[in-house]
């Protein structure tokens, strides 16, 4: 039986149609899978921020239920960030060497387990230990998430959306921890345990998304996968001591004059400096192959010098931005609750616009980053945060909320909303493929240090003014101390804006072209979009 040409043409058309349908379905599945990957990484950011803000909310109730003295209460809040900050660099290196999915899944599972374990704590010692162990999960999740986003989203538009969504997870998590966590603490029978149940659920959801959506890790392009254990000890111990001093300096017996505080600060800084010199030595020996016994550096110092040193500037801008953002939030809360005397829920309502606009700034950034020069975004974000600090630095307690408090809450998150996402997009473009998670680790370390450093420095300034405080009237030194703290916050934001203006002068739109990085030198080859004209 013969086949006519007409039947053959029909068969060809049918096959072509089927192939087209299969390709369309595959493309749709790819889009859905990529969206779920982005959601999983954003969830990691949400879990991180929710955990930080929720702990601050539950501290008063926790202290009452577990009979924790106020002098030891600070350890509950600082134990987690202390451990997280110490192990971010280590996990960044592990992610780049051995893949990102496994650390992401491990971190999510670890976070869920030890967050749930916190609800069984019976005293401050067990709470401190569990909080520290919980911080290890966060240290694994965050660098892995940055590397996963860089691996998954290759096109400029997709990467832009992915990192702005990742950045938006921070204000969303802060809102969940503060608003929902505060409501759960006050309205549920489980009180302080309820926010930890919420975080456990979010961690499990992150784990499920990670297992399902994230692709298996591709093999590392680095042949030598040895870990620099000396460098790991130097940076982990150094950061541990520095963050410890920043969190405990104000509560020590003689505050910053306490001998062990001074000694630990000196030793911590010395170890961090020694780490950088050791990494530089290893990088030189390893690159020239003059010492086969040398392992690859834990973190290449040349990473900081990419794009003519602008990578280092970006890291320091992130540090200063977080100094400003979190010290503003800290002192705004204390102003409302301690100075004005508002209940916690009313304080949350007054700060609610900050959480909303924190998300909106990331949405706005998605539309602007491919059109507006990079330097303008970095400068304007921190400038708006500086204006928010200025409003609280000159605030009149008798004025209505809409005169000072509301515009400050609207403007304050601009620094974090613009600078964080811009920094991540910029740094992942100038870093090599096998350095993506390390970039995320360094950025997260800077945010951890910035949070502690900003609050610590502004507290020192606050304390220098507050001893003369006599009452809470408008022109009293008590008000002056809160204003002085916000002037310090303004200085951080202004320094960040100034550094961005100097470092990125002439830099064009980040996402107009694709950045190409020379693997030998690490310098930009096509740098019109990143390093200026």
Residue ranges with predicted function:
Residues 87-100, 185, 359-376:
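Helix-to-loop junctions at the C-terminal end of transmembrane segments
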Residues 94-230:
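Helix-loop-helix hairpins in multi-pass membrane proteins, especially solute transporters
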Residues 39-41, 50, 55-58, 71, ...:
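Transmembrane core module of solute transporters
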Residues 1-50, 64:
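Cytosolic juxtamembrane N-terminal segment immediately preceding the first transmembrane helix
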Residues 2-4, 25-28, 32, 36-37, ...:
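Transmembrane-helix exit segments and adjacent C-terminal regions of multi-pass membrane proteins
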């Amino acid at each position: 039986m013969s086949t006519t040409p007409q039947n053959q043409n029909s068969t060809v058309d049918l096959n072509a149609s089927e192939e087209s349908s299969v390709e369309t379905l595959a493309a749709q599945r790819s889009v859905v899978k990529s969206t779920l990957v982005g959601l999983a990484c954003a969830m990691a950011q949400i879990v991180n921020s929710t955990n930080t803000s929720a702990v601050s909310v539950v501290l008063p109730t926790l202290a009452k239920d577990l009979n924790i003295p106020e002098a030891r209460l600070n350890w509950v809040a600082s134990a987690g960030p202390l451990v997280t900050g110490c192990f971010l660099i280590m996990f960044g290196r592990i992610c780049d060497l051995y893949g990102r999915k496994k650390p992401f899944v491990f971190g999510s599972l670890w976070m869920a387990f030890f967050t749930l374990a916190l609800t069984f704590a019976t005293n401050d010692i067990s709470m401190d230990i569990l909080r520290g162990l919980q911080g290890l999960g966060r240290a694994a999740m965050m660098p892995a998430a940055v590397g996963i986003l860089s691996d998954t989203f290759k096109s400029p538009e997709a990467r832009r959306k992915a990192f702005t969504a990742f950045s938006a997870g921070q204000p969303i998590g802060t809102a969940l921890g503060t608003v929902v966590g505060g409501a759960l603490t006050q309205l549920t029978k489980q009180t302080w345990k309820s926010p930890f149940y919420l975080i456990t659920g979010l961690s499990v959801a992150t784990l499920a998304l990670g297992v399902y959506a994230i692709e298996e890790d591709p093999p590392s392009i680095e042949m030598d996968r040895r870990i620099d254990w000396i460098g790991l000890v130097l940076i982990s111990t150094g950061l541990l001591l520095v963050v410890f001093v920043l969190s405990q300096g104000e509560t020590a017996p003689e505050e910053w004059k306490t001998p062990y505080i001074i000694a630990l600060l000196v030793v911590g800084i010395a170890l961090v400096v020694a780490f950088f010199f050791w990494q530089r030595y290893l990088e030189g020996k390893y690159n020239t192959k003059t010492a086969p016994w040398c392992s690859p550096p834990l973190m290449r110092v040349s990473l900081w010098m990419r794009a003519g040193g602008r990578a280092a500037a970006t890291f320091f801008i992130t540090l200063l931005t977080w100094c400003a953002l979190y010290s503003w939030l800290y002192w705004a809360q204390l102003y409302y609750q301690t100075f004005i005397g508002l209940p916690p829920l009313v304080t949350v309502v007054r700060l609610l616009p900050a959480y909303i606009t924190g998300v909106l700034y990331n949405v706005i950034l998605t539309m602007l980053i491919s059109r507006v020069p990079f330097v303008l975004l970095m400068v304007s974000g921190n400038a708006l945060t500086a204006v928010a600090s200025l409003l609280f630095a000159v605030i009149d307690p008798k004025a209505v909320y809409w005169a000072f408090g509301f515009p400050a809450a609207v403007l304050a998150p601009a620094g974090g909303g613009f600078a964080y996402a811009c920094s991540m997009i910029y740094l992942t473009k100038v870093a090599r493929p096998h350095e993506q998670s390390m970039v995320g680790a360094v950025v997260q370390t800077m945010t951890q240090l910035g949070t502690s450093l900003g609050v610590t420095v502004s507290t020192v300034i606050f304390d220098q003014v507050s001893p003369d405080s006599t009452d809470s009237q408008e022109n009293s030194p008590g008000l002056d101390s809160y204003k002085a703290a916000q002037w310090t916050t303004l200085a951080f934001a202004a320094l960040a804006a100034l550094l961005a203006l100097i470092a990125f002068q002439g830099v064009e739109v980040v996402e107009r072209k694709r950045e190409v990085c020379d693997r030998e030198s690490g310098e930009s080859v096509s740098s019109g979009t990143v390093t200026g004209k």
